[in-house]
């Protein structure tokens, strides 16, 4: 069996051979006028009219020799067989194909379509040309590859060879399009805000730090677009959203990637309940669009609502309002759950919630979180230790976080100052003091509801895949030692 290097050397010789024949192995233009799906869908009409087609794609298989060759060509839309016959294209063209074309090469073919005796839809070729001569062969075996990280590193091969992978990413593209469609129909406007920020904020997370040489200034990659979007509410926009690439310098697992897409949405004059109602409609809309591709079937509405502290008490017996910090620490130690000693009672309660979150399978709202976990949310009028906030949990995962936005500038400054003290004590996820945002808030911001949806996580939940890595084209993986 030839080694990879031998195969590459042989293909380089073929490139040189093509050039000696006056053939460019990497031409710019093609006469392509159909994609493969067009041909398969309109096959009967094309046959009846004896229509000549021109398609371009990658050679996926070749069989036969001599006077007849069968092969398959694949483009973004599908795969179809093509037939080369010596009496159709001549000996010179047959020799050219046999001697210079390999699996993985891109080719343009022209001809008419017909159906073989076995019923396979086929293009009878009367002309062809090389579009790209590949140096490396496409692997013949891809399914069952044990090294998942290698599969991700070479996602391009995964897309070429695994129909299910391609299908998942096609659905991802559709889902983001449908989300925008849903929001546009409600008169939301899509906006863009800075990724490089002098003060990070909008979430409790550790940021990535970078440096702007031109101004000798340290900057952060945004962890969320929230504070800039709220500035737009202050500026007069009432219904806005952003599909924001965000970055968090935290753990990597099946639910987290250091960079991710977060849909953040703000709706002036809307309450938390109105926001939850809209979110329900969005989930139902996406589920209906997916039809049989969704794992959820008919989702029942309205989604159940569970109060955060009631959920904790039901699962552990702990009372988030009255039990001491020591009691929470004892529970975590007894159950071998790691925690940081400086963590507050509210943070420990949130840690406990995450331990039991996996038990919530059907779409469910968890509401009324502790104030300390929510420095940007409005307090409940009748319970100032809790806020008008919600999580949407689906299949044990948090896919959305939303709340009624705090618009009291003095209260916001006080909370930022409290968070800043926590940051100085070593809490890397505490919110920094952002006086520029406080100044903006002092000009007045309308009451508003806001939410953030982890798009990667939502898509993985709707499609029933186990990890967000399966819905990210290029999730973060360790660098291959061979390439270091």
Q: Model-derived features: where do they sit?
A:
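Nucleic-acid-binding small beta-barrel platforms of the OB/S1 family
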Residues: 1-20
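Extended, domain-scale alpha-helical bundle/helix-rich regions
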Residues: 2-7, 54, 271, 320
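Class II aminoacyl-tRNA synthetase-like tRNA-binding/catalytic domains
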Residues: 15-21, 25-274, 336, 460
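Conserved phosphate/anionic-ligand binding catalytic regions in large, soluble enzymes, centered on
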Residues: 58, 234, 392-405, 445-463
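Well-ordered alpha/beta subsegment
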Residues: 95, 101-102, 115, 265-291, ...
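Flexible loop/turn segments at secondary-structure boundaries
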Residues: 198-202, 229, 248-251, 372-376, ...
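Metal-assisted phosphate- and nucleotidyl-transfer catalytic regions
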Residues: 201, 205-207, 285-399, 418-445, ...
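Active-site pocket scaffolds in enzymes
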Residues: 409-484
């Amino acid at each position: 069996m030839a080694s990879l290097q031998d195969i590459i050397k042989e293909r380089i010789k073929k490139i040189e051979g093509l050039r000696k024949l006056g053939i460019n192995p990497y031409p710019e233009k093609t006469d392509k006028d159909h994609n493969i799906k067009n041909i398969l869908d309109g096959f009967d009409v094309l046959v009846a009219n004896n229509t000549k087609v021109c398609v371009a794609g990658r050679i996926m298989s070749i069989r036969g020799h001599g006077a007849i060759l069968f092969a398959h060509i694949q483009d973004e839309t599908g795969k179809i067989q093509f037939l080369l016959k010596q009496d159709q294209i001549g000996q010179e063209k047959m020799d050219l194909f046999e001697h210079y074309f390999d699996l993985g090469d891109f080719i343009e073919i022209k001809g008419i379509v017909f159906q073989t005796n076995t019923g396979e839809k086929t293009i009878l070729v009367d002309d062809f040309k090389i579009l790209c001569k590949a140096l490396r062969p496409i692997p013949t075996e891809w399914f069952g590859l044990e090294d998942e990280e290698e599969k991700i590193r070479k996602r391009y091969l995964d897309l070429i060879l695994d129909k299910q992978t391609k299908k998942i990413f096609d659905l991802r593209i559709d889902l983001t399009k449908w989300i925008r469609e849903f929001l546009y129909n409600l008169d939301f406007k899509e906006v863009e805000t800075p990724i490089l920020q002098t003060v990070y904020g909008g979430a409790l997370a550790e940021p990535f730090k970078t440096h702007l040489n031109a101004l000798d200034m340290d900057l952060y990659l945004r962890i969320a677009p929230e504070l800039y979007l709220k500035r737009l509410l202050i500026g007069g926009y009432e219904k806005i959203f952003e599909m924001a690439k965000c970055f968090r310098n935290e753990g990597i697992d099946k639910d987290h990637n250091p960079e991710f897409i977060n849909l953040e949405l703000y709706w002036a004059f809307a309450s938390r309940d109105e926001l939850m109602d809209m979110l329900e409609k969005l989930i139902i809309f996406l589920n209906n669009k997916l039809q049989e591709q969704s794992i959820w079937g008919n989702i029942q509405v309205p989604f159940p609502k569970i109060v955060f502290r009631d959920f904790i008490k039901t699962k552990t017996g702990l009372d988030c309002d009255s039990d001491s910090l020591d009691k929470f620490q004892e529970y975590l130690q007894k159950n071998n759950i790691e925690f940081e000693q400086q963590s507050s009672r509210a943070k420990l309660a949130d840690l406990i919630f995450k331990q039991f979150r996996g038990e919530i399978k059907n779409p469910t709202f968890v509401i009324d979180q502790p104030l300390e976990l929510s420095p940007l949310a409005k307090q409940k009028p009748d319970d100032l230790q809790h806020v008008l906030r919600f999580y949407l949990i689906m299949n044990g995962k948090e896919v959305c976080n939303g709340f009624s936005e705090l618009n009291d500038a003095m209260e916001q400054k006080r909370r930022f100052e409290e968070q800043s003290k926590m940051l100085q004590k070593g809490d890397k996820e505490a919110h920094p003091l952002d006086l520029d945002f406080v100044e903006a808030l002092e000009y007045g911001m309308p009451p508003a509801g806001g939410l953030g949806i982890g798009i990667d996580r939502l898509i993985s939940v709707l499609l029933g895949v186990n990890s967000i890595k399966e819905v990210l084209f290029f999730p973060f993986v360790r660098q291959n030692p061979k390439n270091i």
